């Protein structure tokens, strides 16, 4: 029913989700086609954007940019004007939150353009090469455009012990790909499904003769947490799945990347601030004395975002290969997705801002952080975020600005000029940017200074 149309009083449900409906002069609705994307995933406890386009007798609903209902209403008593009203339907106790409500009056060509711009189903296609800007001397090539209707949305990749790519669908399973030769592309026949019964993998790495994956399942069809996947019978197919640690996570601030340690003895698990802290070993590096620590009354987010989520925020765990011992290596992050070690064994991550805090004193931009053992980075609920000058809160190496951080990696081994081989690459999902972060040891401290460069920029 998400995105359907329910008419006033006795008319009731006129058009359900995915339906194109025409109501005749006799008031009877007829389903004349389908609209929308039946693979679209909508999470009811996260913010969703509802768009209603009403022009004459035509009304279209969209959720998160995808059309959910298209109605042509010729009913003799159909309303053509009125008021905007927000209501709860009768039934069991429930909560509905609204924000950023905007009303735009459409007239003439604007009204026609609003209707004409709506498509039934855009589908996933790769950004055209001519819409991608790269640093001078570099060139981008399209290897494969993922068909969203059959292979979902790919959110993570790694290489296995034979140099093949393993990729994950955000709401589906895994695929295996043999990388093509230089100048060649991939076709549908090159994409192999992995038989392992696993889904919603947000992070993965090949280590200790196995594939370790972090599951973060919005739809709760599979328990989130850390899993190990192996080949049970030597047929070169990953088919055995072991859950090493179940974790409680919510939304896209959950269980994320898995990173191997430089000494090859452990793993680092990256989690966002909506992951409930798990049981820790006594050797955990972060002192378990954190708290919200507000001298003045707390001021949670005025829009209601994460009002009940308190310290310690996002945690980086150090984990043994069997997943039995979890140590909190560092915490106090908002929503880190990935991390990477440099040649000296120093760990770096890219933390998120809180976009609703923009222009308030406690706003903290997305930032590159050097993560040291036992460190606290000061994320707290609402207005309680710790400024960088607090003595018990480590500052970032570099502030980036507004964005949505995802993957990070160093360029070691790439056939790039030395400057770019040594760079840390940080991907910003919301602005479609890949930054090259150029780090330099600071002679006046034990940390680094850094500058950023827009290495790749894409436009949808």
Region spans (language model):
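Carbohydrate-interacting regions of secretory-pathway proteins
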Residues: 1-120, 227
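Beta-propeller domains with acidic blade repeats across secreted/periplasmic ectodomains
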Residues: 116-460
């Amino acid at each position: 029913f998400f995105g359907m149309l329910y008419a006033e009083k006795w008319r009731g449900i006129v058009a359900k989700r995915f339906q194109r409906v025409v109501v005749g002069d006799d008031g009877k609705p007829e389903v004349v086609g389908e609209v929308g994307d039946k693979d679209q995933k909508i999470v009811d406890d996260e913010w969703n954007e509802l768009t209603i386009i009403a022009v004459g007798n035509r009304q279209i609903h969209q959720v998160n940019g995808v059309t959910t209902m298209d109605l042509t209403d010729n009913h003799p008593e159909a309303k053509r004007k009125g008021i905007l009203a927000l209501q709860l339907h009768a039934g069991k106790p429930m909560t509905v939150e609204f924000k950023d409500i905007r009303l735009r009056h459409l007239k003439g060509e604007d009204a026609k353009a609003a209707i004409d711009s709506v498509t039934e189903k855009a589908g996933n296609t790769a950004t055209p090469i001519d819409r991608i800007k790269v640093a001078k001397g570099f060139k981008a090539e399209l290897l494969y455009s993922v068909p969203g209707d059959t292979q979902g949305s790919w959110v993570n990749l790694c290489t296995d012990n034979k140099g093949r790519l393993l990729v994950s669908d955000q709401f589906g399973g895994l695929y295996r790909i043999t990388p093509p030769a230089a100048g060649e592309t991939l076709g549908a026949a090159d994409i192999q499904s992995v038989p392992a019964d696993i889904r919603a993998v947000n992070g993965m790495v090949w280590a200790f003769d196995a594939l370790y994956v972090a599951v973060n399942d919005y739809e709760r069809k599979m328990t989130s947490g850390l899993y190990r996947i192996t080949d049970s019978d030597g047929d070169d197919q990953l088919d055995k799945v072991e859950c090493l640690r179940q974790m409680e996570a919510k939304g896209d601030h959950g269980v994320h990347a898995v990173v191997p340690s430089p000494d090859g003895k452990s793993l680092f698990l990256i989690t966002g601030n909506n992951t409930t802290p798990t049981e820790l070993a006594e050797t955990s590096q972060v002192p378990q004395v954190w708290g919200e620590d507000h001298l003045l009354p707390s001021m949670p987010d005025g829009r209601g975002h994460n009002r009940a989520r308190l310290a310690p925020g996002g945690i980086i765990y150090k984990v043994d290969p069997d997943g039995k011992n979890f140590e909190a290596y560092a915490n106090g992050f908002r929503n880190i997705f990935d991390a990477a070690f440099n040649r000296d064994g120093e760990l770096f991550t890219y933390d998120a801002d809180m976009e609703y805090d923009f222009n308030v004193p406690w706003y903290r931009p997305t930032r590159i952080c050097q993560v040291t053992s036992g460190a606290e980075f000061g994320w707290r609920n609402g207005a309680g975020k710790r400024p960088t000058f607090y003595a018990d809160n480590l500052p970032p190496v570099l502030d980036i600005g507004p964005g949505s951080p995802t993957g990070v990696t160093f360029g070691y081994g790439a056939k790039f000029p030395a400057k770019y081989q040594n760079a840390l690459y940080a991907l910003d999902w919301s602005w479609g940017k890949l930054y090259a972060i150029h780090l330099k040891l600071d002679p006046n401290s034990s940390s680094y200074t850094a500058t950023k460069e827009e290495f790749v920029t894409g436009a949808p």
